[in-house]
């Protein structure tokens, strides 16, 4: 167990208070009328439920989605894999995070009156800065054919969601694509050209099928200013269309809270796009205050990753009971 450090605790409290004061000043200056997202990724929820976990708040059992809504959340994020049952897949037996499971979850989200962010991974398994593995069914295709598959997969998914009345309000074209996606074609090691061609096909499908959905480009560079600038300058150079910037922020990989704030402020000034910290695990109050304080109201929200996981989001314990951490959102 680590020794309690009063000075560190005091420093974080003072940081949060300062950011809250600034946020109140800026909040009336929003550049659009879109709702501020207090969001949760709950992509693990169906597996938990099928494993017998029942969720509760204050001893009262209920749907985890409803519990989150009743405690201040208004947005739910779901990841989508191309074929999680493939030999390379995330869920070879049950197919969690496939289209069928996503359709079922989307109904629950909309029935709860919440907004919906769909996260396309364009892989059969986890896509992140360290791996962006081509779906098994696409691995023998040419670059041009993979571009077409990105369009087809995005279009078919969104058409299925629209058909059941659960169109997403926001769409991520790729997950943590700091180093590209759909390697090797979309790697940015030597050039952004391949990635940008792939992104344009995903964006085209989103615009055609769900024109009211906002499009996010998501990188994992929370406190890394130089790398963030390199990425989004390339998006401008190659003419990739998007509406929002998404950042992941985990301190062990992405720097201090001060570095996160400095980077988000620099990005707001340089790109004039709304920004969301679309993945984080800890420090909600500080992160939320930073985002709310961004100039011109360009801070558009936060999403805690795996909110229902006792190991990650920690808003519920191993038995599914809401923890005290949930109180921070209900204010």
What name fits each language-model region?
Residues 38-40, 76-78, 116-120, 169-173, ...:
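Hydrophobic faces of well-ordered beta-strands that scaffold small-molecule active sites
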Residues 92, 97-101, 127-235, 240-242, ...:
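Active-site cleft segment of glycoside hydrolase catalytic domains centered on the general acid/base Glu
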Residues 1-30:
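Bacterial Sec-dependent N-terminal signal peptides
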Residues 42-45, 81-83, 121-125, 173-178, ...:
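Active-site beta-loop-alpha junctions enriched in small/polar residues
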Residues 28-73:
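N-terminal carbohydrate-binding accessory modules
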Residues 252, 273-331:
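Substrate-binding cleft of secreted/luminal carbohydrate-active enzymes
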Residues 60-127, 189-216, 262-264, 268-270:
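Aromatic-lined substrate-binding rim segments of carbohydrate-active enzymes
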Residues 69, 110, 162, 236-238, ...:
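Non-catalytic positions within long, well-ordered alpha-helices that form the structural scaffold/packing
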């Amino acid at each position: 167990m680590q020794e309690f450090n009063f000075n560190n605790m005091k420093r974080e409290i003072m940081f949060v208070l300062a950011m809250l004061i600034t946020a109140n000043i800026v909040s009336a200056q929003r550049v659009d009328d879109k709702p501020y997202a207090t969001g949760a990724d709950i992509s693990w929820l169906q597996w938990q439920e099928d494993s017998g976990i029942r969720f509760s708040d204050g001893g009262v059992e209920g749907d985890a989605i409803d519990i989150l809504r009743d405690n201040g959340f208004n947005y739910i994020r779901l990841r989508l894999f191309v074929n999680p049952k493939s030999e390379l897949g995330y869920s070879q037996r049950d197919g969690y995070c496939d289209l069928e499971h996503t359709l079922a979850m989307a109904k629950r989200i909309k029935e709860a009156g919440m907004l919906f962010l769909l996260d396309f991974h364009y892989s059969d398994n986890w896509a992140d800065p360290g791996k962006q593995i081509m779906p098994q069914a696409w691995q023998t295709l040419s670059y041009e054919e993979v571009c077409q598959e990105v369009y087809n997969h995005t279009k078919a998914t969104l058409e299925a969601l629209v058909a059941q009345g659960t169109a997403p309000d926001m769409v991520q074209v790729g997950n943590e694509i700091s180093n590209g996606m759909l390697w090797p074609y979309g790697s940015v090691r030597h050039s952004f050209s391949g990635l940008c061609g792939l992104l344009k096909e995903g964006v085209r499908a989103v615009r055609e099928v769900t024109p009211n959905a906002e499009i996010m480009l998501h990188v994992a560079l929370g406190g890394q200013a130089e790398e963030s600038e390199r990425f989004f300058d390339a998006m401008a150079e190659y003419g990739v269309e998007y509406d929002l910037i998404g950042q992941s922020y985990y301190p062990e990989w992405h720097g201090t809270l001060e570095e996160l704030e400095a980077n988000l402020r620099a990005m707001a000034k340089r790109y004039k796009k709304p920004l969301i910290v679309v993945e984080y695990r800890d420090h909600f109050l500080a992160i939320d205050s930073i985002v709310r304080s961004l100039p011109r109201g360009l801070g558009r929200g936060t999403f805690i990753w795996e909110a229902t996981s006792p190991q990650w989001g920690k808003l519920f314990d191993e038995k599914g009971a809401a923890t005290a951490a949930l109180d921070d959102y209900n204010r």
